[in-house]
Amino acid sequence: MGLVSSKKPDKEKPIKEKDKGQWSPLKVSAQDKDAPPLPPLVVFNHLTPPPPDEHLDEDKHFVVALYDYTAMNDRDLQMLKGEKLQVLKGTGDWWLARSLVTGREGYVPSNFVARVESLEMERWFFRSQGRKEAERQLLAPINKAGSFLIRESETNKGAFSLSVKDVTTQGELIKHYKIRCLDEGGYYISPRITFPSLQALVQHYSKKGDGLCQRLTLPCVRPAPQNPWAQDEWEIPRQSLRLVRKLGSGQFGEVWMGYYKNNMKVAIKTLKEGTMSPEAFLGEANVMKALQHERLVRLYAVVTKEPIYIVTEYMARGCLLDFLKTDEGSRLSLPRLIDMSAQIAEGMAYIERMNSIHRDLRAANILVSEALCCKIADFGLARIIDSEYTAQEGAKFPIKWTAPEAIHFGVFTIKADVWSFGVLLMEVVTYGRVPYPGMSNPEVIRNLERGYRMPRPDTCPPELYRGVIAECWRSRPEERPTFEFLQSVLEDFYTATERQYELQP
């Protein structure tokens, strides 16, 4: 397409041999067979099939498969990426559909398909993605310079934003550009050149940067769709699980990487016999089941016969403490570390709203995904509470992360978690250094009684130490900030010095 031409490409023109394997902004993602596929998502919520709805507007209910899907039972409809289907019943996580290729009917996960001719078919379109989450996804190591996405504007309804990954001598940055709409239809970033569609805009800036920070290269790698695992799969047979690799062990048992039905990779936590009763273990599982948030490690299912298993989502990079000590983790920039801390605060703010506590918040209990997103794990001693949770006598808890009132009186509230979060922040900014270096647990207790606090390390900005960490360590629990406040401060830590949008090229 030329600079101002609006001629549409010939859809019937075959792809030349030299083009195979290369991403093109004009290739619809669902038809792009040579693009690296996302990991398949296995889904399990098989409910009683509802009858087809005979009153659907068929013109609006044709979809294309965005991913391959392998049927899990005879009620599912197996489909291949790019396959066209007619939706017969389109509500909830599962849609009843008929393949226009095979003529077969069955259920498909709704997040595996997109309407024909919709923007959702484009690999670069992230409709409801917010600015902060767009930055997090583009900063994932798999995305290189020029990776991009287009999303709906958060502030200007009907408009869009282009987010692009830039790599400079100062490091990796995400630049945002406003995509403005013309009254008569069409779009532009710079008023000197307009485009009839977002696809045409992407095509132009994929050929040359033309004033952008980078030429657009590849769409941001999209995380696999969320798994709609439902209530009826809560208790599963042990035979459906296969333990593959031991990841670690803790107070209550071991953690393994394994597979559910030889298909979906999961983490499997086993109960160490004699550590706690099966009833207490199931209590832990029920608490985790009630707490559902994108910043919390998701609970899938349990095996209720001994040895008891609890099945959760698998986080590829393991715990944050170990990751910070790796070559990749030790090279993370301070803004990236603060953003990861903001993600943890977001998860804890949800726990706070749910009137719950964690009670063992530390870097070892934060897990990291392949895209370097953080999720809170190990709710082994968390409890739904009215106002406070009193630990049982003899319960083990990590002194260096525990608030003074919890050490001395065994009383845990969300404010004790706030204290622990301050210690966790010190772990993060020191890339996994042990808190209170050189001190034994009794020395830590005595020093805290005298008002001692860990000093600011050289790697910690004074504003972060004074405005966040020190506030978490106030002696009076009620004077400590809320996690909601901590989340907002950490998310906006660099906003005051950032330009919200790049200037028009």
Curated annotation (Swiss-Prot):
Binding-site list for ATP: L247, G248, S249, G250, Q251, F252, G253, E254, V255, K269
Alphabetical list of Pfam families matching this protein: PK_Tyr_Ser-Thr, SH2, SH3_1
Boundaries of every Protein kinase domain copy: 241-494
Database matches in Gene3D superfamilies: Phosphorylase Kinase, domain 1, SH2 domain, SH3 Domains, Transferase(Phosphotransferase) domain 1
Active site, renumbered: D360
Membrane topology reported for the UniProt record: Lipid-anchor
UniProt enzyme class: transferase
Modified residues (Phosphotyrosine): Y389
Biased composition (Basic and acidic residues): 7-21
Documented activity regulation: Antibody-mediated surface engagement of the B-cell antigen receptor (BCR) which results in the phosphorylation of BLK on tyrosine residues, stimulates the enzymatic activity.
GO biological process: B cell receptor signaling pathway; cell differentiation; cell surface receptor protein tyrosine kinase signaling pathway; intracellular signal transduction; peptidyl-tyrosine phosphorylation; positive regulation of insulin secretion
Gene Ontology cellular-component terms listed: cytosol; plasma membrane
Assembly behavior: Interacts with CBL (via SH2 domain). Interacts with CD79A and CD79B (via SH2 domain).
Family membership: Belongs to the protein kinase superfamily. Tyr protein kinase family. SRC subfamily.
Protein name (Swiss-Prot/TrEMBL): Tyrosine-protein kinase Blk
Organism: Homo sapiens
